[in-house]
Amino acid sequence: MADIPRNLYMHFPFCRGKCSYCALYSRGAVALSERKAYSAKMADALSKLSARGAKFSTVYFGGGSPALCDLDAVLSSLAPCLEIDAEVSVELHPLDVKKPLLDMLRSEGVNRISMGVESLDNATLRDMGRRYSLNEAKDAFFTVREFFDNAGIDLIVGYPRVGNAEEWKIEKLADWGITHCSVYSLQLEEESSLASREGIESSLPGDDEVMDSLKNIGEFLESISLERYEISNWARKGRECRHNSAVWAGEDYLGLGTGAYSRVALRRMRGAWGVDGEGAEEVSVVSEEDDIKERLLFRLRTRKGLDASFCPRWKETLEKFVAEGVLSSAGDIYRLTPRGMEICDYVLAALV
């Protein structure tokens, strides 16, 4: 039997409706009975892990919208599996934010909230299919802050311009009191409804415009004491997402539920309901070399950088990037410079 990782991701695929840019597996308009059955299956998987002595240092409830499921039952089964100081994060859609839910989450051990805001412009929010206004998102976040002092948001940049959209100003976040912010560049996924729109390619902002937006966002976030600790993530000191940081550091993680990914030693699984691959949709085994490469490349995305002593054949390429000002080095530790952050995908591709 496999050792159980200390990091757990649980996927809840149900959502209020498919967003225009989303190509992830998700299901909308599902009956309550089906959502309850899914929650019961998740709770049962946790009970089995508990019986095997599982102890998790980080737990992440992702989706979809986890709040559409019976989180009370899931959290009750999770409790015996938590280390004393475990980080337990839950993703919330602004329309799911209600005080009774937040009170239950807090009482059951949740200590971190990530809310998907996605845009600071009402016209763009409507076009995305997000179903709330910026003011509604702000009110929801302020309600979250009444219960949690560790709360952040997600944003997307690079979305097509929408009609006479209001100006997208990051400064609108000045009084929100966020402790964390994830900022992702739009990836036009073939399976998304956005990709099927006529002329969509011509309406996308150019790379330079997206880079300028990311630069402005980063400068603003740093002005309110959020530090960039990964390519797409900023946080107040001590408020970094421990779960994602563990994954980027190369630690193993177990993913439970439809569409969830796991990395357990050399095994990679998708859609498993247990550490031994119970019910998995996919299971594969990678080579030791590919395993090391994957874990090291994740580390390069963070401010901690990667230790090239684990992969000496990269040394020449890494030194080339140092000479170009894309990387900095201290011994065998290599880190992306601010310029390197802008072209991270190019750097990673050169090392694969």
Regions found by a protein language model. Give the residues of each.
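Flexible, acidic/Gly-rich N-terminal and inter-domain linker regions that tether
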Residues: M1-Y9, G17, F56, E324
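Local cysteine-cluster metal-coordination motifs and their immediate loop/turn environment
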Residues: H11-S26
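C-terminal scaffold of the Radical SAM
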Residues: P5-N7, L24-L49, S57-F310
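Beta-strand-connecting loop/turn residues
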Residues: C15, T179, D252, D332-I333
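Basic, glycine-rich polyanion-binding accessory segments appended to enzymes
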Residues: G277-D345, A349
